[in-house]
Design a protein with these regions (language model features):
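Bacterial N-terminal signal peptides
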Residues: 9-20
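C-terminal outer-membrane/trafficking sorting elements
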Residues: 629-678
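Short strand-coil-strand connectors
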Residues: 30, 432, 440, 505, ...
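Positively charged n-region of N-terminal signal peptides that target proteins for export
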Residues: 1-8, 678
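Boundary at the C-terminal end of the N-terminal hydrophobic targeting segment
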Residues: 22-26
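Structural signature of tandem-repeat unit edges
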Residues: 39, 54-76, 86-99, 109-122, ...
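A recurrent domain-boundary module in secreted/ectodomain proteins
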Residues: 611-630
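Consensus positions within tandem repeat domains that build extended binding/scaffold surfaces
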Residues: 79-81, 101-106, 124-129, 147-150, ...
Length: 678
């Protein structure tokens, strides 16, 4: 046996000392641990209980204890004293208790709190958080401080009586108390902190006292509030304060200068809002998704409306905007689909992106003479608009500003505008520097000096049935004619590029002439052109993009030039009537997966250069087509071998005239050639 050294003994003693101090108590009496909090005042605090010593989870804490012949008053429950003690069900507090520390009863899921001691002055942070058996609570009158999250997630708490004279209800004090139905707010309270009643879904009403000045961020977020009084003393309402409440009406006090972000967002039942003079700012998403709101008068004092402020207010038909308004944020009226008119004030210099996106009810809009910028999709989807006028002040127009404005028949740009024009009364907006047509309509006539047709220029203008593209045009942008009802199109040879999906969804398109200098068929170019029957791909083309002819169900034949080296994913997907493919490339173009998915290969003839049959038969995605040489291409006296596609011999050394009519329907290999029997 080895002899213990002095160093070994020292290590053991240190370990014992450390383990003792980790318990953090001074002494134990009757199974309860205590700390001496003041020797001079002879006070102690409860800091826990001996594991296994409890009496069915019930404790009677004495008012005084005697330790070493000294009498101490028990004045506090220390921090984390009973933290997550699931055995604890009841404690009788002595009147001497003044403080309950942070997380003292946190997570005591079986603890029934009955009465707090009258002498209590302080409740710590998260003191009773997640005590799921507490159903009601009365805060004694002497309490001057309640910590943050004090009763957070007391999910069965239904009523709270605040008898104390506190001035503030701290952050998340009652958050996630989902069954809380009743609580009084003392007249002394000036501030309701952040998230105090967050997710108190059963809380339907509350009375705020006169004198209250501040409602914190998310204070009533996702509560069941249907009504609430708003005293005139309130000066500040935080962001998300009433988010997702069931309020039907609100009168915001004159003392409030700013409505912050998402304050009343997703209040789906809110139908009446009263705003007063003195208000200067309506924040982003302030009334987003208030779907019952039909009309609103914004005070003259308001100078700013934030992004998405009234987005998805789908019943809003009328809104009175003040003359002093200087800024309207992006998407401010996004999908206010029943809004019929709005006057943009003269002080507004920018119309931001998506400001009026999806406002289907707008029939006219006047862009003020001071506006210098119109953001992307600002009026996209305003399907009731019939005319557009651009003032001379406009210096920049971003993409898709008037996309899907289906009823527009007149477009004019002020003649003094230096950046844009509508030359020759073309009923379009043209970028004067680049000669690019950026916005068209059903009545557009493309001028002869136009060099480009911009992306989405005629996007989903369903009343456009024909268009003439002049020889000056060299490029057509992505989805430029998507969703139009043109029936035929002739693209001049000067065009060298046609963008992604340029004729996507042109369901009435039956014929197309592509330019001879085109280098690629871009993805989705003729996707869903369901009435297209045939098309000649120019010899200059080297690639056919993804889904370029997908869903062209009436496409009967296609001719692929010899320079084509690649065919994209699902390029001819669901071309169910395709009966002939002529491919001039001696090497089979590389096809991505499903290039010919749902094409009836058994009934689709593949014509390839002589000598290339075997290469096509061996190539992915080309397998399964039958070649142009049918059985009738052989001499009657020819002796042939017949195999199925798996290489199994079907007939051996048989004369062709004896083979006629004997093979079941299918694809066979006869003397090295793939043959279809139908």
């Amino acid at each position: 046996m080895k002899t213990m050294t002095l160093r070994n003994w020292f290590a053991i003693i240190v370990a014992l000392l450390c383990s003792t101090s980790a318990l953090a108590y001074d002494f134990e009496i009757d199974g309860i641990y205590y700390n001496i909090t003041s020797e001079s005042e002879k006070t102690v605090g409860v800091c826990g209980e001996i594991n296994g010593y409890y009496l069915y989870g019930r404790f009677n804490i004495p008012e005084t204890i005697v330790y070493k012949n000294v009498t101490y008053s028990v004045t506090s429950i220390e921090e984390r004293a009973f933290y997550k003690n699931n055995r604890l069900s009841y404690i009788a507090f002595p009147h001497s208790i003044k403080t309950i520390g942070d997380e003292a009863f946190y997570g005591c899921s079986n603890f029934y709190l009955t009465v707090l001691p009258e002498g209590l002055t302080n409740i710590g942070k998260s003191a009773f958080a997640a005590c799921k058996k507490i159903t009601s609570i009365e805060i004694p009158k002497n309490v001057t401080n309640i910590g943050e999250r004090a009763f957070h997630s007391c999910t069965n708490l239904t009523s709270v009586k605040l008898s104390c004279d506190i001035t503030s209800i701290p952050s998340q004090a009652f958050a996630s108390c989902r069954y809380l139905r009743q609580i009084n707010i003392p007249s002394t309270v000036k501030n309701i902190g952040k998230g105090v009643f967050y997710e108190c879904m059963a809380l339907a009403s509350i009375e705020l006292p006169d004198g209250i000045t501040e409602i914190g961020d998310s204070a009533f977020y996702f509560t069941g509030l249907t009504t609430i009084n708003m005293p005139n003393s309130i000066t500040d309402i935080g962001s998300h304060a009433f988010y997702y409440c069931k309020l039907t009406s609100i009168d915001i006090p004159k003392s409030v200068k700013s409505i912050k972000n998402s304050t009343f967002a997703s209040c789906f039942n809110l139908s009446s809002v009263i705003l007063h003079e003195g208000l200067t700012d309506i924040g982003g998403r302030a009334f987003n998704y208030c779907r019952e709101l039909e009309s609103l008068k914004i005070p003259n004092s308001v100078t700013n409306i934030g992004e998405y402020a009234f987005a998805e207010c789908s019943k809003l038909t009328e809104i009175e905007v003040p003359e002093k308004l200087e800024k309207i944020g992006p998407s401010a009226f996004w999908f206010c689909s029943k809004l019929t008119s709005i006057k943009i004030p003269a002080n507004v210099t920018r119309i931001e992106s998506e400001t009026f996106y999806g406002c289907n009810g707008l029939t006219s809009i006047e862009i003020p003479a001071n506006v210098t910028h119109i953001g992307s999709r600002a009026f996209c989807g305003c399907r009731g608009l019939t005319s557009i006028e651009i003032p001379n002040s406009v210096e920049s127009i971003e993409g898709n500003v008037f996309r899907e404005c289906l009823e527009v028949s007149s477009i004019k740009v002020d003649k003094n505008n230096k950046m844009y024009d509508s030359r020759e009364d073309c009923n379009a907006i043209i970028d004067s520097k680049t000669n690019t047509l950026i916005t068209g309509c059903m009545s557009t006539i493309i001028p002869n000096n136009t060099t480009s047709i911009g992306s989405d220029a005629f996007y989903h203008i369903s009343k456009l049935t024909s268009i003439n593209i002049p020889g000056s045009v060299t490029s057509i942008g992505a989805t430029a004619f998507r969703g139009t009802r043109i029936t035929s199109i002739e693209i001049p040879d000067n065009v060298t590029s046609i963008g992604f999906g340029a004729f996507w969804d042109c369901e009435r398109l039956t014929s197309v002439k592509l330019p001879n200098n085109l280098s690629a068929i871009e993805s989705y170019l003729f996707d869903f052109c369901t009435n297209l029957t045939s098309i000649v791909i120019p010899n200059s083309v080297t690639s056919i993009g993804e889904k370029s002819f997908a869903y062209c169900r009436n496409l009967n034949s296609i001719e692929i030039p010899e320079k084509v080296t690649s065919i994209g994913h699902s390029a001819f997907y669901l071309c169910t009537n395709l009966r002939q493919i002529t491919c001039h490339a001696t090497e089979p173009p590389v096809c991505e997966k499903q290039a010919f998915e749902q094409v009836d290969r058994l009934n689709c003839k593949l014509i390839v250069p002589e000598g290339s049959e075997e290469a096509y038969m061996a190539a992915n995605e080309w397998r399964g087509f039958y070649t142009a040489d049918g059985i009738e291409g052989f001499e009657d006296e020819s002796i042939v071998d017949v195999y199925n596609l798996q290489g199994v011999t079907v007939k051996k050394q048989v004369r062709m005239k004896d083979l006629q009519g004997t093979l079941p329907k299918g694809i066979y290999i006869i003397n090295g050639k793939k043959i279809a029997v139908r």
